[in-house]
Regions:
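Active-site beta-strand/loop signature of hydrolases that rely on acidic residues for catalysis
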Residues: 3-7, 20-51, 99, 137, ...
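Short, flexible loop segments at the rims of nucleotide/cofactor-binding pockets, characterized by
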Residues: 5-10, 126, 164-169, 193
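Structured beta-strand-rich core segments of catalytic domains in phosphoester-bond hydrolases
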Residues: 10, 35-147, 249-252
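Short, acidic/polar
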Residues: 11-21
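Active-site environment of divalent metal-dependent phosphoester hydrolases
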Residues: 11-13, 36-39, 80-82, 157-161, ...
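Charged helix-capping and loop-helix junction motifs
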Residues: 52-57, 166-174
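Metal-dependent phosphoester-hydrolase catalytic domains
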Residues: 104, 177-190, 195-265
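Metal-dependent phosphoester/phosphodiester hydrolase catalytic core
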Residues: 121-122, 131, 142-169
Length: 265
């Protein structure tokens, strides 16, 4: 089974992202920063106090179209205004999506907010403190004759940086509660995503207490599209390192400002 995690950057590099999706071979594809604008396709522009970025209007639909033999699961963390190319405003949902190959029976789904609660930003997106969710899916791997629980996370963004804060500690505790509630005894468990944390965060101690081992550590998980010197963001943890056949932090192709994390079990 191949599990891939990627912060998709709202599809800002869709011309590169689309062929990568076609060829990545993921049985479970966990994406963060997924957009959904009802009734609209093509491109939009996202703006907050810090950034102005191109985004796909409906990255969720774009990926579903390219993965017709996967179940596409989506949970929205918040919503706010974006503009199309004619500068007309639309309401865009923003969140997480997990795509599961149709030959893997989905036997459990659960989502929870790890920070805040769903919010409609009426006039402008805030540049920090936005709600964050996690999405768990439990599947049966027939070939390996085991159950696998995969938890997809997009962690809290704080304009002050990625150091631990009380909000991030509370996020870790909520995440741990979700993991414990979603998996069952004996499940191989994978927790992955853009954590927005430093490698020495106490979050990893909280997850280690659940028997989860981080495979990323202090490695660089950003691409050349990210200009800042601090290169830590994405992580992937497993409950049984012995079940890992291969793990890669993919340096090419570049399809986002984050590198994809590729796990073969």
């Amino acid at each position: 089974m191949r599990i891939i995690s990627l912060n998709a950057w709202g599809g800002a590099m869709f011309d590169d992202l689309a062929p990568w999706i076609d060829a990545c071979g993921a049985d479970v594809l966990c994406l963060q920063e997924v957009t959904h604008t009802p009734g609209l396709g093509g491109w939009t522009r996202f703006d907050d106090a810090d950034r102005s970025l191109p985004q796909r209007a409906n990255l969720l639909a774009d990926v579903r179209e390219r993965l017709p033999h996967h179940h596409g699961l989506f949970t929205a963390s918040d919503a706010g205004p974006v503009q199309d190319r004619r500068r007309r405003f639309h309401r865009q949902d923003f969140g997480l999506a997990t795509f599961v190959a149709e030959d893997l029976p989905v036997v459990g789904i659960r989502s929870a907010f790890v920070h805040g609660a769903y919010t409609e930003h009426r006039d402008r997106w805030p540049n920090g403190g936005r709600p964050r969710a996690a999405l768990a899916v439990r599947v049966h791997d027939r070939r390996a004759e085991r159950f696998v629980t995969v938890v997809n996370l997009h962690g809290l963004r704080d304009p002050r940086g990625k150091a631990d804060t009380p909000a991030r500690q509370a996020q870790a505790e909520r995440l741990a509660d979700l993991v414990e509630g979603a998996r069952e005894d004996g499940d191989l468990t994978v927790v992955c995503g853009d954590f927005n944390l430093l490698p020495d965060s106490t979050t990893f101690k909280t997850l280690a207490d659940l028997g989860l081992t981080d495979l990323v550590g202090g490695a660089d998980t950003r691409t050349s599209r990210y200009p800042k010197p601090l290169r830590h963001a994405s992580y992937l943890l497993v409950s049984d390192p012995g079940a890992v056949a291969r793990f890669e932090i993919a340096t090419a192709p570049e399809v986002s400002d984050h590198r994809a994390l590729v796990l073969d079990l």
